[in-house]
């Protein structure tokens, strides 16, 4: 009679245990399809002031070409559909058309290295312009804990 409820509880507890050992965040939300339906994407516009510090000319992270303002988009390097989070350490400026065409692919290691280097440079600027803020602290922690690489490995 309670088999479905019990099965859900066991799966949920199992994913909590996995999250203790696995650096891939939100495993339970990935395992349960219903969680995904309830998650809504938020506007990334609040990150522009930070991204502008390191990339004031709005050069596409992937193509290296300057982006016209009307074609400027903020993108997750590691797909949002894998991490379900909007963190500065994973966000870059891209051309809208490129962003639409790339889909939810897991990036190559060279892209991860480029993002890691970008974050180091961005952190230096943020520590001067936005010291002691939550966003700066999160970026610093992501670098110190190698979060990009761990998340990338978890997505693969």
Spell out what each predicted region is.
Residues 1-59:
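Short, charged surface segments at domain edges that flank catalytic/cofactor-binding sites
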Residues 4, 11, 22, 38, ...:
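Detector for Asparagine
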Residues 14, 47-51, 67, 114-118, ...:
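Generic hydrophobic, helix-prone segments enriched in Leu/Val/Ile
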Residues 62-93, 102-114:
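Histidine-centered nuclease catalytic patch
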Residues 96-156:
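C-terminal structured domain segments
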């Amino acid at each position: 009679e309670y088999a479905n409820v019990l099965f859900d509880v066991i799966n949920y507890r199992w994913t909590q245990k996995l999250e203790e050992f696995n650096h891939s965040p939100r495993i339970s939300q990935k395992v349960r399809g219903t969680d995904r339906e309830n998650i809504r994407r938020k506007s990334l516009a609040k990150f522009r002031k930070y991204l502008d510090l390191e990339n004031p000319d709005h050069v596409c992270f992937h193509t290296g070409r300057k982006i016209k303002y009307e074609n400027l988009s903020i993108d997750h390097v590691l797909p949002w559909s894998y991490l379900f989070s909007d963190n500065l350490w994973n966000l870059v400026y891209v051309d809208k058309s490129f962003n639409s065409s790339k889909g939810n692919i897991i990036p190559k290691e060279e892209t991860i290295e480029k993002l890691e280097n970008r974050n180091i440079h961005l952190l230096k600027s943020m520590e001067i312009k936005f010291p002691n803020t939550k966003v700066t602290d999160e970026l610093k922690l992501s670098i110190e804990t190698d979060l990009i690489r761990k998340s990338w490995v978890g997505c693969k």
